[in-house]
């Protein structure tokens, strides 16, 4: 199974993506890791990408798309979950064209929907446990709200990430994601149109619900 997943930062996309990955034994392919792997291995594409990154510039799509495909064909040969790409409408169209040319199926697209303000509140409400950062603690979500400054799972001390408290940075990321004309949601809606044509499946999930309810809904639809 090959799956593409969308969701704003703060929507629980990582949690639900891990569920799908583990359930179907998929390779979790995250956009940032693609660049890191190619650069670390010194591939031709990696060297080209590094030149742009070192100059603080965005890597062009004609380099990014082949890098993504290479990882999908190798690491994801037995099935993949692609997370964090595409980020805009142009990339979505180019990715779809490339998949078609390579004869790679896109079996399912998952979109986790969440109101922008709620997503921001969740990001700013995240707290990390000193013993295990994966312990769920968030002052903005009643189901996983910690007891003061201690972890609700183990009692360890909690702290917040500095970037989680940077409203300007959060707003910039969300400006890109919630852009329905050219941004990430525009990319998601491109695949939604393909699903209407019977070319893939499109699953919409209400990210405002609790984790277990979203999980059950996702598994039922898969």
Regions inferred by a protein language model and the residue ranges of each:
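Glycine-rich phosphate-binding loop of ATP-dependent small-molecule kinases
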Residues: 1-222
């Amino acid at each position: 199974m090959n799956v593409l997943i969308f969701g704003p930062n703060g929507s629980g996309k990582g949690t639900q993506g891990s569920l799908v990955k583990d359930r179907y034994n998929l390779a979790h392919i995250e956009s940032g890791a693609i660049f890191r792997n190619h650069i670390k291995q010194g591939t031709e594409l990696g060297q080209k990408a590094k030149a742009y990154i070192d100059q603080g510039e965005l890597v062009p799509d004609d380099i990014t798309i082949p890098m993504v495909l290479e990882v999908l064909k190798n690491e994801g040969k037995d099935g993949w979950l692609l997370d964090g790409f595409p980020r805009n409408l142009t990339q979505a169209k180019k990715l779809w064209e490339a998949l078609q040319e390579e004869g790679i199926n896109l079996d399912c697209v998952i979109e986790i929907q969440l109101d922008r303000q709620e997503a921001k509140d969740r990001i700013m409400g995240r707290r990390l446990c000193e013993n295990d950062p994966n312990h769920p603690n968030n002052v903005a979500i009643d189901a996983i709200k910690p007891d003061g400054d201690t972890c609700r799972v183990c009692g360890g001390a909690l702290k917040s990430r500095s970037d989680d408290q940077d409203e300007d940075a959060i707003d910039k990321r969300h400006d890109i994601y919630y852009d329905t004309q050219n941004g990430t949601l525009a990319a998601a809606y491109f695949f939604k149109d393909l699903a209407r044509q019977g070319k893939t499946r499109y699953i919409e999930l209400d990210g405002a619900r609790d984790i277990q309810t979203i999980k059950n809904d996702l598994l039922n639809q898969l």
